[in-house]
Amino acid sequence: MTASAPTTTLGNNHGKEVILVVDDEASIRRILETRLSMIGYQVVTACDGIEALELFKTTQPDLVVLDVMMPKLDGYGVCQELRKESDVPIVMLTALGDVADRITGLELGADDYVVKPFSPKELEARIRCVLRRVEKESIAGSPNSGVITVGDLRIDTNKRQVYQGDERIRLTGMEFSLLELLVSRSGEPFSRGEILKDVWGYTPERHVDTRVVDVHISRLRSKLEDDPANPELILTARGTGYLFQRIVDAVASEGT
């Protein structure tokens, strides 16, 4: 396949959110560029993984739409490379019925997925939902925000950051939103359905693999727990879902 020059509308739409669309199918790139531009986003496109990483460095997009199967470097490889340096939201495009694609992408740090063939409206809805989470970060800092400390774990809901001792633990926007939800009702379980609705904005009408939640819980545990196989913070509620340990010795303080 002959690589096409990257397409960008950056020069004409300053101040708008930038989306990097990565797919080796030219027709999909054209459709998404047109649709996303029409609803107000700046769009940059890449036809393979190598081009995507190069464009990411120069454009610093607000969100990446990333196909799995691509030449040179596949979507998994791109996701891994991006997660080494960035928490940018990533929405994966996966093959119809291929559960392994979805789970692998989430395990590598993707925030969400859309199954091919997909409706552009569905992808637009997923993008809006994920970006709303990011927007929440940018407007954080209200007088009601604060810091919750559990042992040596410090959760700053003002800056949407987590520290273990003096070390900052890097979380994606979705991971922090999931943690924030669990902490908001510590000691009480959330069902997977509740989590999908509150964190990802999924409705019951959309049949989503609940392993989306399981994978993100696993990633959170790997980052926050001393022994992820025997968690003490994020617990499994048998037959229900998950809960954060009851905060009885936590210290809550106002953000500064």
Feature locations, PLM:
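Conserved acidic segment of CheY-like receiver
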Residues: 15-27, 32-36, 64
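A structural micro-motif at secondary-structure boundaries
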Residues: 148-176, 189, 206, 243-256
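Acidic catalytic/metal-coordinating carboxylates
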Residues: 48-51, 74-77
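Short hydrophobic/Thr-rich beta-strand motif most characteristic of the beta2 strand and flanking loop
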Residues: 40-47, 55
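DNA-binding patch around the recognition helix
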Residues: 145, 170, 215-217, 221-256
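Basic, amphipathic DNA-recognition helix from helix-turn-helix-like DNA-binding domains
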Residues: 24, 80, 84, 89-149
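Receiver (REC) domain active-site loop signature in two-component systems and cognate sites
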Residues: 70
